[in-house]
Amino acid sequence: MDLAIITLCVLAVAAFLFITELIPLAVTAMAACTALGILGVLPSKQVYAGLSNSTVVLFGGMFVIGAAMFKTGLAEAIGIAVVKKAGTNQVPLMAAIMLVTIALSAVSSNTGTVACLMPVIIGICQAANISPSKELMPLAIAANVGGTITMIGTPPNVIVTGALTAAGLPTFGFFEFAYIGIPLSIIIVLYTLFIGRHFVPDKQAGAMDEEAVKAAAEEAGASGDGAPKSKTKMWISGIILLGVVACMALGLKTLPLHTAAVTGAILCVVTGCLKEKEAYAGIDWVTIFLFAGMLSVASAMEKTGAGKMIADTVVNMMGENPNPYVLTAVLFLISNVLTQFMSNTASAALLAPIGISIAQSIGADPKPVLMALGIAASMAFATPMATPPNTLVLGPGGFSFNDYVKVGVPMCLISLVASVIIIPIFWPF
């Protein structure tokens, strides 16, 4: 059988498993690359090559640094300080919550940020006689959009970066995502404050699933044990984070991104901000293995021509010489709609290699197409299962499925329009 057909069959099975989640996402990705090796599509040396990719190392290091922020109490301290200064008026409080959440989500786990701030926000809302639902939905929204500002802010950013690397193409810089992430954050915050908040229901707080919140906090590296926090370690973790970000911003040749991240992670453990086991626990291993596995799948699609076959089919459906702006908008919609019902990490991993092939088939730069796919996967606001932050606020906010639809659909459309306008400015076709 033709190797391209074999690759497409493996991809189809992986897509089905990603959507249904009959088995864990990471297991699906690793099984896919293993199958490609067994079936002779990939040589043995390339089957698990994704695990040694520098982007995987970068992501692992930043996971540990982010976990240190939560474990030392730094993230919570920042959140409490900012939110309390905003007072108890609903709109200023909402603005403060969204801004601090965006900032924290850009450099750490957005799931951990929500889990960390949610109890604080509920307490303030109850004291101020404000319905928690009015502030919890903006919290989830801000966590989603904040992750789009840096490469490590959200898994889809890492996925699209890795896809470019696997294809041997120029890749995105660490802060390059800010060109679209910051404008989108500003637009979404302003929309929420002036228009979107009117769609957020005013409901009595539901029962907080303390186990779910605790699990999310622990996954991000927060202890959740209520133990006193060391201010010294808070300062140390903050200095380490700032130092790593500064090194990345300077783009030092002797200290590439992944080396800076690992150096910071080592310092977090050596200085006692995290114990060794806590550092391991702070890493999102699902994202690591899913990303590494799909890198090999992407390589197989490029090597066998399977990606080109899919791309040619899509382009032919849109007619000869399709407008790259229209094509980007269509791919944004596909990615965004798909993410409403499956993991944004999985949808980005599934679509990234296809996006590269489509861009190359029409003679366009893959960067704007990949950026649109990644952003679309992160800007999924319309269902409670689209992203972990959406799910976390579901119970405590007392939200229904339709509440997410009413609030999220306009934001998805706004994100589409803004992305189609902004992305080509910084990444021309």
PLM feature segments, named:
Residues 1-60, 64-66, 177-312, 328, ...:
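Hydrophobic transmembrane alpha-helices of multi-pass small-molecule transporters
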Residues 6, 65, 128-141, 146-159, ...:
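Juxtamembrane and boundary regions of transmembrane helices in multi-pass small-molecule transporters
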Residues 14-23, 100-109, 141-152, 246-253, ...:
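Transmembrane alpha-helix interface/packing and boundary motifs in multi-pass membrane proteins
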Residues 27-32, 110-117, 137, 149-153, ...:
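Hydrophobic alpha-helical membrane segments of integral membrane proteins
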Residues 29, 60, 98, 119, ...:
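Residue-level recognition of transmembrane alpha-helices
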Residues 44, 132, 174, 257, ...:
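Alpha-helix N-cap/start motif
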